């Protein structure tokens, strides 16, 4: 593996790019249902939706599990990675979200195995195939970040960036915003990404929580929509 000064920077761009095929582009995280129900129809509505997800869900569950999985991977402690996966699965109460977390995680793992050579990735591939680990997307992303030579901070920020850009892409496809508006929102949310990451570093696995009731209901109602562009 190339351990030059540029390699981690290039890996950071690769992992956070929407071009990286992790399957997350198929997810709207409730945005589609809220848009069809006319609960989100403006730029301000979308910004609030993203901020709620960042501060009340992503930064208090997914990102927390990712950080602990990264630390476990860094010290070659796969039991810690498995525990983070188990705890995050238990915190993910909506069945469809569990299913999509597995699918996108395994899609990411498949791409990573073809891209990087690493014994942890090999072990995780075997364990997800056996069903002994869920292989949720944030957990796999954590290990891939470590394998790619990223720091804990860069891995966490790459995860947040890819999550937000994925949702902004969904908002464009749902005709809520245009491309220029998406870029403005992404820039505006930069302080939220930083705050979300910093807070997540201070949360233990057994302290994870989420509080997004309206979004949760929208995600559960998604399967009842007459037409759907997204998987959730």
Swiss-Prot record:
Entry's localization field: Cytoplasm
Top-rank taxon, per record: Bacteria
Pfam families documented for this protein: UreF (PF01730)
InterPro entries: UreF, UreF_sf
Membrane-traversing stretches: none
Main location: cytoplasm
Annotated keywords: Chaperone, Cytoplasm, Nickel insertion
Statement: the UniProt record of this protein carries the keyword Cytoplasm: yes
Entry GO terms, CC: cytoplasm
Gene Ontology molecular function terms on file: nickel cation binding
Family: Belongs to the UreF family.
Subunit structure: UreD, UreF and UreG form a complex that acts as a GTP-hydrolysis-dependent molecular chaperone, activating the urease apoprotein by helping to assemble the nickel containing metallocenter of UreC. The UreE protein probably delivers the nickel.
HAMAP family: UreF
Role played: Required for maturation of urease via the functional incorporation of the urease nickel metallocenter.
Name of protein: Urease accessory protein UreF
